[in-house]
A protein has these predicted regions:
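Peripheral interaction segments used for macromolecular assembly
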Residues: 1-93
């Protein structure tokens, strides 16, 4: 039996930086609150953790630290998600 967990799209992964962090364009206007959330792909596989938000307020980017053993370049061009319940929790802060 599969459990349905709603996901919230946070943005698309654009590239992998030299230090190994993935850079994703964030769709949320309150992106600073996303730091610390676990990111996933559409299949609910963990990708990594949002470590920082950079760029201008109206066009933010998230720096995602990939989990160990993950080939980050495989996710370039793909959407990144967080669990809806986690997203709602941090947006209420």
């Amino acid at each position: 039996m599969e459990v349905y967990v709603p996901l919230r799209r946070i943005g698309v992964i654009l590239h992998v930086a030299k230090d190994g962090l993935m850079v994703a364009r964030v769709n949320s206007s309150k992106a600073d609150r996303l730091v610390g959330l676990v990111t996933m792909d559409y299949s609910m596989r963990r990708i990594g953790v949002i470590k920082d938000i950079i760029g201008p307020v109206n066009a933010p980017y998230a720096l995602i630290k990939p989990i160990k053993g993950l080939n980050a370049t495989d996710y370039v061009g793909k959407q990144a998600y967080v669990r809806d319940i986690d997203y709602d929790k941090v947006m209420r802060r």
